[in-house]
């Protein structure tokens, strides 16, 4: 009996109980859930359904809980049902009923935990989208990890996800980048508002190598040469860094294309059609205050040049024309004001604001020896993706960035995350997988194979805890996808790894000495194989390796 099976049983039982006592069964929620109690002594699962229904149906919640408990206790697979507190029902599942979860995992394999709840949903997931003026900084690195994990997570629920990088190659920052390259190529100091760091000198040298006479060109042509070649070289480095980090994109959209293809003008025309654009002081404005923004925004400035939001409008319209049902934007902490702006843009273009979701990520700080690490040797300013990977490796970097909710600032202790200790969360989870892999190899050498024929022998408390936890995996994925919170997967894996280590310490899996292999050994091996599969599935969603040996 899986948690989903138990929830269905609970809903059906509640409907029958309400009908029996002349109460309105229409008060039942569409979705009924069960939870694992924090204290295992309270039971295997618990529900507060009686508390939810009491006031709605005019019944005392504790009395209603008693009726529910009595009916559930008589159901197949339920060992006990007890009322607790003001109206909770604690449930214990018969071992024979819960052990089916082991077989479910082994049958589904790499697909265990997946669902079709988002089937038919076409999602555009835009993240990182760093300017091509320097290496990806640590904040963008957080999105590279979290965004990729979220894309994998949504895919497990059936969504068709397109990972997109919006390439900001239009505007003043590109001019400053070009001027910085020219200064470096001439051996001059960086402009006051320019970019510094060894990467600028490296790219400038590469531009000169590709175009030997570039410094002799007229200023406008020279600036354009450094801009075009320099931006491409920088973006090649960004894509290479992301690929080595395990993050790849399906689509790269150039901001400049929004302006050169006429799509900005098309978006402005659309705004005028819907009545949300107006002219004032020689500029074109968007009525974003109608949708919660603190002030209306200029779309076309009085000098005729498009404001930054003009590209955003054209870009959103472009996404919707490509057929996306949902557009998720992952932005940095300094972009909080964009939430209302993007939703207003959608509404102003005649769309539903709910087709836009904006996730805001908070700051990331690195710590070494108790002191903050602030400077990058290559970038000359902020810490970069490459710096983090060099310090702790790809797996630890991804896991450390995904592990916390994105709306929480995080400190990454470089010593902790590079250590081979149980205090290192990614090591703790990966070690559980490696330990399970070693166990499988040892069993194979002894000629013992996992067998689900005798799962009824798995009656130890630690076995039950482990079985129930692997049964939680589908719900964890569904919740994490719905809330856009991949950190829930990493926290779950740490909990599961802990349950496995405690099980292994309490329950001998393989025979020792002259002991003959038995059905219990084979059943425990099946449980271990299922646990290993779930850990591997979870790590895959995070983009973290599941090592066979450590």
UniProtKB/Swiss-Prot annotation:
Q: Which residues form a coiled coil?
A: none
The entry's cellular-component GO terms read:
cytoplasm
* Entry annotated with the keyword NADP: no
**Broad class of enzyme this protein falls into:** ligase
Pfam families noted in UniProt:
Arg_tRNA_synt_N (PF03485), DALR_1 (PF05746), tRNA-synt_1d (PF00750)
Ranges spanned by the short sequence motif 'HIGH' region, renumbered to the chain: 130-140
Residues spanning the membrane? none
Sorted UniProt keywords: Aminoacyl-tRNA synthetase, ATP-binding, Cytoplasm, Ligase, Nucleotide-binding, Protein biosynthesis
The cross-references to InterPro entries, in alphabetical order and at most eight, read: aa-tRNA-synth_I_CS, Arg-tRNA-ligase, Arg-tRNA-synth_N, Arg-tRNA-synth_N_sf, ArgRS_core, DALR_anticod-bd, Rossmann-like_a/b/a_fold, tRNAsynth_Ia_anticodon-bd
Catalytic activity reads: tRNA(Arg) + L-arginine + ATP = L-arginyl-tRNA(Arg) + AMP + diphosphate
Q: Say if the entry is tagged with keyword Nucleotide-binding.
A: yes
Q: Which domain of life is it from?
A: Bacteria
Q: Which family does it belong to?
A: Belongs to the class-I aminoacyl-tRNA synthetase family.
PANTHER family reported for this sequence: ARGININE--TRNA LIGASE, CYTOPLASMIC, ARGINYL-TRNA SYNTHETASE
Complexes and interactors = Monomer.
Q: What is this protein called?
A: Arginine--tRNA ligase
Look up and give the organism this protein is from: Mycolicibacterium gilvum (strain PYR-GCK)
Supply the source organism's classification.
Bacteria, Bacillati, Actinomycetota, Actinomycetes, Mycobacteriales
């Amino acid at each position: 009996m899986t948690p989903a099976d138990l929830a269905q049983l609970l809903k059906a039982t509640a409907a029958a109980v309400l009908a029996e006592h002349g109460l309105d069964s229409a008060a039942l929620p569409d979705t009924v859930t069960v939870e694992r109690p924090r204290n295992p002594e309270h039971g295997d699962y618990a529900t507060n359904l009686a508390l939810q229904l009491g006031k709605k149906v005019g019944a005392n919640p504790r009395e209603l809980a008693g009726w529910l408990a009595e009916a559930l206790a008589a159901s197949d697979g339920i060992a006990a049902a007890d009322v607790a507190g003001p109206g909770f029902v604690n449930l214990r599942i018969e071992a024979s009923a819960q052990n089916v979860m082991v077989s479910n995992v082994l049958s589904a394999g790499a697909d265990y935990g997946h669902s079709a709840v988002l089937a038919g949903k076409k999602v555009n997931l835009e993240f990182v989208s760093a300017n091509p003026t320097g290496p990806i900084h640590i904040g963008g690195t957080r999105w590279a990890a979290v965004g990729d994990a979220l894309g994998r997570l949504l895919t497990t629920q059936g969504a068709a996800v397109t990972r997109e990088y919006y390439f900001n190659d239009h505007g003043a920052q590109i001019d400053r980048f070009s001027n910085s390259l020219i200064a470096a190529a001439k051996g001059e100091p960086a402009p006051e508002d320019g970019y510094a760091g060894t990467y600028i000198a490296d790219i400038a040298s590469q531009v000169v190598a590709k175009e030997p006479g570039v410094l002799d060109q007229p200023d406008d042509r020279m600036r354009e040469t450094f801009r075009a070649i320099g931006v491409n070289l920088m973006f090649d480095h960004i894509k290479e860094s992301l690929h080595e980090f395990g993050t790849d994109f399906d689509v790269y959209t150039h901001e400049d294309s929004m302006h050169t293809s006429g799509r900005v003008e098309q978006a402005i025309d659309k705004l005028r059609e819907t009545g949300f654009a107006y002219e004032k002081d020689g500029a074109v404005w968007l009525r974003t205050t109608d949708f919660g923004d603190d002030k209306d925004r200029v779309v076309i400035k009085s000098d005729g040049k498009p404001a930054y939001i003009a590209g955003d409008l054209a870009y959103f319209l472009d996404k919707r024309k490509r057929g996306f049902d949902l557009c998720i934007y992952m932005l940095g902490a300094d972009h909080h004001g964009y939430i209302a702006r993007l939703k207003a843009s959608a509404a102003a273009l005649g769309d539903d604001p709910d087709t836009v979701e904006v996730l805001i990520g908070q700051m990331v700080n690195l710590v070494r020896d108790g002191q903050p690490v602030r400077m990058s040797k290559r970038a000359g300013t902020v810490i970069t993706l490459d710096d983090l990977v060099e310090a702790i490796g790809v797996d630890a970097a991804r896991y450390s960035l995904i592990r916390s909710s994105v709306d929480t600032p995080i400190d990454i202790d470089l010593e902790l995350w590079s250590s081979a200790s149980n205090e290192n969360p990614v090591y703790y989870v990966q070690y559980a997988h490696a330990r399970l892999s070693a166990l499988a190899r040892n069993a194979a050498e002894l000629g013992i194979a996992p067998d689900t024929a005798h799962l009824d022998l798995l009656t130890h408390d630690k076995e039950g805890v482990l079985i129930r936890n692997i049964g939680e995996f589908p719900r964890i994925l569904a919740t994490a996808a719905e809330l856009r919170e991949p950190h829930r997967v990493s926290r779950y894996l740490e909990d599961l790894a802990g349950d496995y280590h405690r099980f292994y310490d309490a329950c001998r899996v393989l025979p020792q000495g002259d002991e003959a292999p038995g059905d219990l050994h084979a059943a425990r091996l099946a449980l271990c194989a299922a646990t290993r599969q779930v850990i591997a599935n979870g790590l895959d969603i995070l983009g973290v390796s599941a090592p066979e040996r450590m």
